[in-house]
């Protein structure tokens, strides 16, 4: 009799990871629920204990083992410290990308394999495919459309593709572009073939207490926190001028580093100006500590749009660089509609040229490349 394959499932206390655990148990895997304990600032509510209890209840309902894995050191160093350093330098990092890279698919995967697991699994909305099951007319999932790849298949089918989930509104491939072939070969995405409503129905079917639980939002693992308030505990704030696109002072802000290009913000607007209410940040000058805003309802100001960006590095999930120039699609922010582009290699860096000008490009954010539903990889925006 073949030994059951062992899967360590990252359980956060939410509905997606709970259903991932239940599905894999139903499919016959030897599953263990793993709660990742990460660093949390002492000034934040201590929510992790309740989330851990929620994850434990799910494991108890399903009758599967539960363990807690300490990832505090890695999370603090690779996610929080990096985020603070990037904001201090005037860039806008994406902590979820680094949480996936260094924590979920870094230390968690490493320790799971050391403890004898064949795979880890998460509640991410994404899908994994084998190149051997690709065809000119589309891509075919491993093992009849589910993430139940066997270890023998992994040995034989050693090339994997990361694809968007069935539920495009929930798709998280944007945050997973740093994955490599080794990580993908040992990772399962059980909920990637379902829509969110279907996942909630499955949670009810399995009798899980998380079935009606609201989706988590905000910073990876920490939850919904005001980023500006969070950063002010680590970075000194300094007031500066808010400018309109004519260079006129129209208000005051509490620190240029706290604001993100393209995002909607409210400011204390000087009454003598015609501008009022919420505006969109189109540029910021860290040295002068000024930010420039425009009203997106007015005629779009093309001065702050760009046709190209530069990335220092690109992680190609395949492990092999494609030929250049490369025609592809790209997202420069989460849930953005994919934009047609051409990728060029210029020395040690990469240039992405958009078919149409893009506004709201933030240095430090991720540009993620696609070929249709296939996530090719991506990198950090260095110049825009």
Where are these regions (language model features)?
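ATP-dependent adenylation/nucleotidyltransferase module used to activate substrates
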Residues: 1-177, 188
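AMP-forming adenylation/ATP pyrophosphatase catalytic core
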Residues: 121-127, 142, 157-384
């Amino acid at each position: 009799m073949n030994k059951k394959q062992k899967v360590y499932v990252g359980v956060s206390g939410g509905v997606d990871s709970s259903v991932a655990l239940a599905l894999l148990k139903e499919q016959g895997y030897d599953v263990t629920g793993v709660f990742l304990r990460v660093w949390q600032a002492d000034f934040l509510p201590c929510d992790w204990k309740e989330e851990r209890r929620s994850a434990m209840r799910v494991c108890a309902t399903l009758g599967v083992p539960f363990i807690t894995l300490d990832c505090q050191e890695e999370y603090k160093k690779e996610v929080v410290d990096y985020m603070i350093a990037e904001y201090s330098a005037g860039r806008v990092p994406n902590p979820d990308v680094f949480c996936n890279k260094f924590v979920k698919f870094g230390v968690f995967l490493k320790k799971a394999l050391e403890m004898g697991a064949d795979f880890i699994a998460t509640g991410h909305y994404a899908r994994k495919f084998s190149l051997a099951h690709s065809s000119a007319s589309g891509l075919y999932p491993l093992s009849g459309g589910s993430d139940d790849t066997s270890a023998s298949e992994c040995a034989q089918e050693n090339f994997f593709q990361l694809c968007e989930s069935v539920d495009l509104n929930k798709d998280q491939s944007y945050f997973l572009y740093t994955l490599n072939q080794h990580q993908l070969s040992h990772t399962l995405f059980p909920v990637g073939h379902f829509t969110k409503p279907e996942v909630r129905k499955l949670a009810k079917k399995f009798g899980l207490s998380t079935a009606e639980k609201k989706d988590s939002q905000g910073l990876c693992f920490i939850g919904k926190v005001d980023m500006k308030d969070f950063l002010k505990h680590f970075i000194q704030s300094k007031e500066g001028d808010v400018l309109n696109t004519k260079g006129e002072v129209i208000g005051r802000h509490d620190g240029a580093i706290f604001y993100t290009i393209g995002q909607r913000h409210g400011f204390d607007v000087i009454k003598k100006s015609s501008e009022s209410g919420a505006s969109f940040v189109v540029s910021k000058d860290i040295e002068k500590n000024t930010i420039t805003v425009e009203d997106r309802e007015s005629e779009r100001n093309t001065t702050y749009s760009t046709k190209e960006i530069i990335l220092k590095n690109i992680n190609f999930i395949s492990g092999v660089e494609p030929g250049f120039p490369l025609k592809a699609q790209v997202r420069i922010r989460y849930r953005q509609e994919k934009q047609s582009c051409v990728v060029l290699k210029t020395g040690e860096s990469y240039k992405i040229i958009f078919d149409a000008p893009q506004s709201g490009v933030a240095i430090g954010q991720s540009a993620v490349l696609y070929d249709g539903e296939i996530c090719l990889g991506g990198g950090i925006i260095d110049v825009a």
